[in-house]
Amino acid sequence: MLMATAVPVANSKPDVDRLKSILPGVPLVESPFFDDILPTCDFDAETARVGRDLHEKGFAVVRFPDEEFDARAERIKNRLAPRFDFAGWRENGWKVNDGLRVQDAWTFDADVRAIAVNARILQILEKLYGRKAWPFQTLNFPVGTQQHYHSDSVHFSSIPERFMCGVWVALEDIGDDAGPLEYYPGSHKWPIVYNDQVGVRIAGAKRRASQELYHQVWEALVEKTHLAPEYFSPRKGDALIWAANLLHGGSCQRNPNATRWSQVTHYFFENCCYVTPMASDMFVGKLQLRRLVNIADGKQVPNVYVDAPYASLGISFRFREFLATMRRSLSPIARKIRH
């Protein structure tokens, strides 16, 4: 009997052009081939570092690239402070792990908007995700959120998934007793959890889904993987970029008299559908599509599915319409059997 002879295979370089092209629906920085592709990219050193950190840990820390940042931060604090009931929060909200916030202050505050549309941040994100980034939401906080760790992907996600990220920036120095941001490095690599996986259906449900439904899943995953949280106690102007599925939240604010002024900007990327998974039955025809405005130009961004405008596809994601279509397609005999 002839025996096959093992032939040693020489180490060959990966076909990077092929690796770049086979997963167009996955952000570059989330690609399993990112380490092979990165050396061939024309990135400056800072962008490459941010990319490596985002890919491996799910977050990256940068100095916010704005020469006017200090003055801008002071103006934001001075303008927004009168909107908050600090005394009431210290008396009641702090004790129940509640926070204070203003959503979408960019609509009336030029400095909030300037942070959201920072050209250098947009440039870094576009290079690392492979699609043009656009800001769609701002949140401004004067104190700690004290919010349970969570993935943003249950609140807003994209199709294809993971074309979303957040940028959190400190508007002042933040101490350890002010409820610093907490996050779980590496958790961004876990699968995104959807309603059906936790036994929740939106259509016909008597209660609305909430983030709390996912808490036990995230807690169990953290326990199983022995993942330890890290905490971000930054200097004014330090910013943290996080990936769509990174578990993050606000730690307990031990000192209710402290402030924790910060701004979060959430970004999507072009040529996606933008959805709210927690309010959707993702795989049976009911999506809560978001109709969002690009903060940079004030224009509504179209939902796009694999290079085609969603509106042009003639697809209905409304569950009742989906069921009605199915019923109309049934034969009279099938309908009789069904009833």
Please identify what each model-predicted range represents.
Residues 140, 151-153, 169-173, 185:
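Short, structured patches in soluble enzyme cores that scaffold and shape functional sites
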Residues 176-247:
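Double-stranded beta-helix
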